[in-house]
Amino acid sequence: MEKLQLPNGLCVSPVALGAMNFGSTTSKEEAYEVLDTYIDLGGNFIDTSNNYAHWAGTGDESETLLGEYFRDRGNRDKVILATKVGFDRHGKGAGLKKEQIEYWIDESLRKLRTDYIDLYYAHTDDMNTPIEEIMEAFDRLVKKGKVRHLGASNYDTWRLAEANMTAKANGWTEYTVMQQRYSYLHARGEVAPKYTFNEIVDRERLRYLYDKNMPLVSYACLCKGAYEDESRLPEDCIAGARMALVHKMAQEKGLNPSAIAIAWMTNLHRLPGMPRVIPLFSATPAQLRDNLRGVTLTLTDEELELMKNT
């Protein structure tokens, strides 16, 4: 895979690997195989969080397993590593107070067995903490060398703008990447009503990211396997025409449907007013090999327009 140089200077693969279930529902042996396959295929952008996967374990497993992997393989310097802070951990409360940010970065560094995080996300917004306190605390991590770049996840557009305006006015580090739920089936923002507003990218957010030259890392981009198994779609999802088009294109091109969905996202920046999108997903080694075929697929202008207008 050819690498992309992001506006913040990070050089990443065009798709990111999610480590959400590593160490919990995905065993150490399986996770190592996935990581080896992803890196062998040219990937270098690995995403985790300090609370993965609390719904299946304690929430420490993913970072801990990744730290062991980097130790065993000796390849930490070969990857761009992203993790997050903000949700409740071990009853210490959700939030982005400076004490929480400072505590959890050290915990993440320890578990990941690294001296720095390439991309550190605010995993969720904290409306109860002054935005100045949040951005100054993150900036201190950058100045100390613990973090290279900052990102925001699950932020409303106006709050992302407020955070970066505050940082800019004070000479602090700004958010340079947004991570948000986004998929071809959810591309208009109104077709996944089971999710709350701030979890889905809408037109306003896409335009803001384009105007600010901020890439979008799209989580849940393969809808938990729904492109291959439509029973995984929410009952009230109204994206049937798009699903049918994806399957038609997949059959014509000899690809699996998820590869077409990935191609849509990696080609999306070619449309007027659309930001660069980096799909983020978890997969088995076999699924990785199939899905990543979409990265090298260049959609024609006509195909992009057809997909957009369906």
Each language-model region and where it sits:
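Conserved beta-strand positions
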Residues: 17, 48, 83, 119-122, ...
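Short, acidic/polar
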Residues: 26-38, 96-112, 161-165
